[in-house]
């Protein structure tokens, strides 16, 4: 069965990372995975949360949100509802965990960096695009701190590994990389995988949407994901060069 956009099973969608997309933040990136577009901004604050003070460690966290018309039909803003939804909270925490795997918090010193990831247009893979773009925005924010001699460690030691993420799944019995919305909605198995540029795992989230899956299928999906993350790491490297 052909993919909706004609890609081969092991091909990513076209990926674009546009740095400096927003004027005010210390780091900003518009990341595009095909038709999925996420604006990632990094905001630096001197100091850390109260529970972190005196530790000598910095803090990195993230918030995720979607514009009301990022999808086919309009959704109410969560601020209007008066509470953050479970999905939004879960994705925000995933992004934060993933980015903390890329940074030496001791070398960062007692500085805080908040990554805001706002989905402008959704066509599947919003959380994986957010992680991939937010890493580049975080890198730029650390460079900003380094230029002001505000880091506790040597600048080159702060960002000690790259982090990217991609979705994989089984659709019509076939393992596929980087699912768009149509594929994600019909997937029998769906995984989101966060990897370093070296191909080590940071986090794996997966479920059998329409039944169970075998160890062989899982291995095939993880192989696809690692290859995709390595390719995304190269795109990040080029964007930062």
From Swiss-Prot:
Pfam families in alphabetical order: RNase_PH, RNase_PH_C
GO molecular function annotation: 3'-5'-RNA exonuclease activity; tRNA binding; tRNA nucleotidyltransferase activity
Superkingdom assignment: Bacteria
Keyword set, alphabetical order: Nucleotidyltransferase, RNA-binding, rRNA processing, Transferase, tRNA processing, tRNA-binding
EC number annotated for this UniProt entry: 2.7.7.56
InterPro entries the record matches: ExoRNase_PH_dom1, ExoRNase_PH_dom2, ExoRNase_PH_dom2_sf, PNPase/RNase_PH_dom_sf, Ribosomal_Su5_D2-typ_SF, RNase_PH, RNase_PH_bac-type, RNase_PH_CS
Reactions catalysed, as given in the entry: tRNA(n+1) + phosphate = tRNA(n) + a ribonucleoside 5'-diphosphate
Keyword set includes Cytoplasm: no
Residues binding phosphate: 87, 125-127
The keyword Chaperone belongs to this UniProt entry's keyword annotation: no
A Gene Ontology BP annotation from the UniProt entry: tRNA processing
Transmembrane feature ranges: none
Enzyme class: transferase
Binding partners and assembly: Homohexameric ring arranged as a trimer of dimers.
Role noted for this protein: Phosphorolytic 3'-5' exoribonuclease that plays an important role in tRNA 3'-end maturation. Removes nucleotide residues following the 3'-CCA terminus of tRNAs; can also add nucleotides to the ends of RNA molecules by using nucleoside diphosphates as substrates, but this may not be physiologically important. Probably plays a role in initiation of 16S rRNA degradation (leading to ribosome degradation) during starvation.
Family from the record: Belongs to the RNase PH family.
HAMAP family: RNase_PH (MF_00564)
Protein name (Swiss-Prot/TrEMBL): Ribonuclease PH
